[in-house]
Amino acid sequence: MKRLLVFLAAALLLIPAASAQEQDAPKMNKKNLVIKEWNTDAKGNHKTLDHVTTFNADGKKVEEIEYSQDGQKWRKRFEYDQNGKVSRELVYDNRNRLQTYKKFEFNELGKKKIQYTYNAKGKLLSIKQYEYIAQ
């Protein structure tokens, strides 16, 4: 029984130390950052670009591009409102032609409330509503 109590006490002492380390970990500065993801074959001989994510001077994601071995598969561009929330997400095909775009509305807490998806000609394709339930 004493061993169990000593073990539990030691475990409780380690929890705050782990939390402090997580809080002290430096956050990645995303200002003007470009992240490139590469795929390499098992032998390390053939390297191909897989995905690129670009952030602006404010650290907001402004573009994502997905690649295949044949080149660009698709591209997403992100636009922001005056509150710094994504207001539109535009999706382009491999030839940079607009395919679909999404518009977003947010609730009073800044969480997504409604997502509208349109085709390239502006026809509404779908509406997604978000519901947040605290438990």
Can you describe what each PLM-predicted range is?
Residues 1-4, 21:
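Positively charged n-region of N-terminal signal peptides that target proteins for export
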